[in-house]
Amino acid sequence: MEQIRLDHQLPVKKTDHTSKGDQLKWKIGNIWYKSDYMGYEGLSETLVSHLLQKSTLSHPFVLYQPVRIAYRGTLRSGCSSPDFLKTNQMLIPLEKLYRQNTGDSLAITLAAFSEPAERIRFLADQMEHMTGIQNFGAYLTAMLEIDAFFLNEDRHTNNIAVLYDTETEQYSPSPLFDQGLCLFADISNDYPLDLPMDVCMERIEAKPFSSDFDTQLDAAEELYGIQLHFSFTTKDVCTELASLADYYPLEIRQRVEQIIRRQMRKYGYLMRS
């Protein structure tokens, strides 16, 4: 079990926005550490990124590892990941980029469209125009496939981002990141462990193109096609969860296994043996 003591380290002050508050976050050398805030975010980050290694995803993604963080007299679970920014690179959220170019809010602009497909196409076209990145619609679709499968309720316009190289003045897609609020990880507020699975499914809402995961996923795949397939098995899921036994109790791991099994059945067209 990896453990790090951060009693004398100040958390990084966040300047972005999240829909459910901020986790404590530190950068030590080239490694980021995030503490669980509402439940088992570290498990979600770790499990989702490890399972993405068994997929056909063509875009880079951040790989997370579990960690126990000692901070101000408490020991809490969380995750760590390498800093993916290279020299001269900046991470620019799409909300910020759109405001810089138009003076308007991207989230409000998207909400003005009546259909999810219109929102997705508009965003893809705008980002290709503003950044020169090609096939941005395919990138968005892969992101939405991951979010639908793993039930990511926190995919807003501030955590979809691009990279900007200040030396070459070129943009590139950001590695996919921020999967902490997947798999009903918020057990403090919306999805307590004793809440039935069907109620959790009814309660969760997607972002940013529709409140329904399948509505925005179907719209994106209709526009840009299916972008990835998963090749992990239920045995792989159980193995990954077993490796997290030192960090999260059995009740949480069993719940997550149940969720993944359910999603594998629902999205069978994304599964490949």
Label each PLM-derived region with a short phrase:
Residues 84-144, 248-254, 266-267:
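ATP-dependent phospho-/nucleotidyl transfer catalytic cores
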Residues 56-59, 154, 270:
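Short helix-capping/linker segments at secondary-structure and domain boundaries
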Residues 1-106:
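Conserved ATP-binding subdomain of kinase catalytic cores across diverse folds
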Residues 36-37, 53, 167-273:
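C-terminal catalytic region of ATP-dependent kinase domains
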Residues 41, 45, 139, 153-156, ...:
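Active-site-proximal structural scaffolding
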Residues 62-71, 156-166, 273:
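Short alpha-helical "patches" and their helix-cap loops
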Residues 28, 33, 64, 81, ...:
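Generic structural hydrophobic/aromatic packing signal, biased to beta-strands
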